[in-house]
A protein has these predicted regions:
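Conserved P-loop NTPase nucleotide-binding/switch module
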Residues: 1-88
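NTP-binding/hydrolysis catalytic cores, primarily Walker-type P-loop NTPases
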Residues: 73-139
Length: 139
């Protein structure tokens, strides 16, 4: 249990302190549930106010990707969400992509926070990837 907590908190601290490229995984039923699960894991190993934990999570986690297993056994991206904002007790997220069983992964909204992509010189690549996806040419 301690390893899970330590690993989770260290990943969160890495993201919060400006280390680019942090990546972690967590078991949850949706993107929104992943945020609550992360809060719970941190609370299990540390006596810290929930609001402080939520603030750190909101400022260090940018994108959430929910993978799931379909009825045929294939794993698919079911949802990609972005943390748009945080207000004292609630994360404001919006769904960028959502899986539809008849149409596959569909764009729902455009990325809100593009500053980091621009800072790291990746914004043009992101725009090109979205363009290809919309045209149905993305792999």
């Amino acid at each position: 249990m301690f390893y899970v907590f330590f690993s989770t908190w260290e990943k969160n601290v890495d993201g919060y302190t400006g280390h680019s490229g942090s990546f972690s995984s967590i078991h949850a039923n949706s993107c929104r549930d992943a945020l609550r699960r992360l809060e719970t894991m941190v609370l299990m190993g540390m006596d810290m106010p929930l609001g402080a934990i939520q603030g750190l999570i909101a400022s260090s986690v940018d994108i959430l990707i929910h993978l799931g297993r379909c009825l045929n056994g294939e794993r698919k991206i079911l949802e990609i969400s972005e943390i748009k904002d945080y207000s004292r007790t609630e994360y404001e997220t919006h769904t960028l992509f959502q899986y539809d069983k008849d149409h596959g992964l569909e764009i729902q909204e455009d990325l809100f926070h593009v500053e980091k992509l621009k800072d790291y010189g990746q914004y043009e690549k992101y725009c090109e990837a979205v363009k290809l996806f919309r045209e149905g040419r993305a792999e």
